[in-house]
């Protein structure tokens, strides 16, 4: 009887030991399965309630994953930067009329509402002072353009042109037409842009102004390029504008001509040709000490290298462009540069510089465009 009891005892004891061993093995197996990332280091292995024994969260995202997502999120904003650069160029190229010099006494203080501007203009129109009326309208259009009010600027210039055409001020009429052409091109209205630029060119021919003719031909070429008539655009610059500028020894305008031609090649994705003309522009600018366009030229050179995936050279040229843009205090161009530099750093897995570039980008973008949503 005692032997039988001992046998039962050892059998039960063996079963208990076996179960404990199995539980331990299962726990060890669970340890390996429940948290492969290794972040859960303490949990109740005896839990037998509702739900899973352990809620395992995904491992924290890596620095590379966070940066990759941030760079993807800002990709959609590149068009806004390019558009802002075009507007900045448009404002810089806006010509003033002679009539504006004679209306300054009426603009102290400057009207701060649309109705105040309208009252001022209407009073001069009623008096038959059309010179003053279009001078005021042109000034108002310039102010509207700087605020990015494109439609308003176009409307004001159209009205200014109507009043200017009641006078004999041919030069001012041409200036208004030139400004209209440029704004219509920015607004992607190719037909109207071409109409007004041709009118400006015809006046330049009549007045035998070589530089104005060449400048207008450059604009006509850009209009043609945006209309995808690339052959005519190239010929207008190479065969017409450049010879005129050579005859006038207008070196600064020739730099702009090379840039314009390069931009037309970039529109066609012909980046090797674009770089050749940009190098001509850069060499001429350096030889004549015309530094105003150097930052833009260097940026365009770097951009072509970037598109060709020649990242090491592109990086070097973007950094040079950045130094030039900083010396000019051109923050919008700095933003465009750091945007591309960051993309290069990410492509090359240089995450330290990519992170620094992203922070710089965010600071500049907030300063120029407001808070980033």
List PLM regions with ranges.
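N-terminal leader/linker segments that initiate helical-solenoid repeat arrays
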Residues: 22-135
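Amphipathic alpha-helical segments of tetratricopeptide repeats
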Residues: 118-123, 158-163, 168, 198-206, ...
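Single-residue signature of alpha-solenoid repeat helices
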Residues: 113, 153, 193, 233-234, ...
């Amino acid at each position: 009887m005692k032997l039988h009891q001992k046998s039962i005892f050892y059998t039960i004891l063996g079963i208990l030991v076996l179960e404990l061993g199995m539980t331990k093995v299962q726990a060890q197996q669970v340890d390996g399965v429940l948290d492969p990332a290794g972040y859960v280091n303490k949990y109740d292995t005896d839990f037998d309630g509702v739900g899973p024994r352990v809620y395992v969260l995904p491992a924290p995202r890596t620095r590379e994953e966070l940066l990759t997502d941030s760079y993807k999120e800002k990709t959609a904003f590149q068009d806004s930067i390019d558009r802002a650069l075009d507007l900045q160029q448009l404002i810089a190229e806006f010509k003033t009329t002679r009539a504006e010099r004679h209306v300054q006494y009426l603009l102290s203080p400057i009207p701060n509402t649309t109705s105040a501007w309208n009252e001022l203009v209407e009073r001069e129109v009623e008096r038959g002072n059309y010179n003053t009326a279009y001078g005021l309208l042109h000034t108002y259009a310039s102010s509207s353009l700087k605020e990015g009010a494109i439609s308003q600027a176009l409307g004001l210039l159209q009205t200014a042109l109507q009043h200017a055409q009641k006078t004999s001020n041919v030069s001012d009429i041409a200036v208004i037409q030139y400004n209209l052409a440029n704004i219509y091109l920015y607004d992607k209205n190719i037909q109207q842009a071409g109409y007004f630029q041709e009118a400006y060119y015809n006046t330049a021919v009549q007045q035998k102004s070589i530089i104005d003719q060449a400048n207008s031909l450059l604009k006509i070429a850009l209009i043609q390029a945006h209309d995808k008539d690339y052959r005519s655009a190239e010929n207008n610059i190479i065969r017409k504008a450049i010879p005129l500028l050579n005859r006038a020894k207008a070196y600064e305008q020739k730099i702009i001509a090379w840039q314009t031609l390069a931009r037309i090649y970039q529109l066609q994705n012909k980046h090797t040709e674009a770089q050749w003309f940009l190098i001509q522009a850069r060499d001429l600018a350096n030889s004549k000490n015309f530094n105003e366009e150097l930052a833009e030229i260097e940026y365009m050179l770097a951009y072509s290298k970037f598109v060709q995936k020649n990242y090491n050279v592109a990086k070097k040229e973007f950094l040079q462009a950045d130094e030039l843009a900083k010396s000019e205090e051109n923050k919008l161009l700095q933003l465009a540069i750091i945007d591309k530099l960051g993309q290069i750093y990410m492509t090359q897995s240089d995450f330290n510089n990519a992170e620094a570039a992203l922070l710089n980008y965010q600071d500049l973008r907030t300063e120029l465009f407001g808070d980033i949503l």
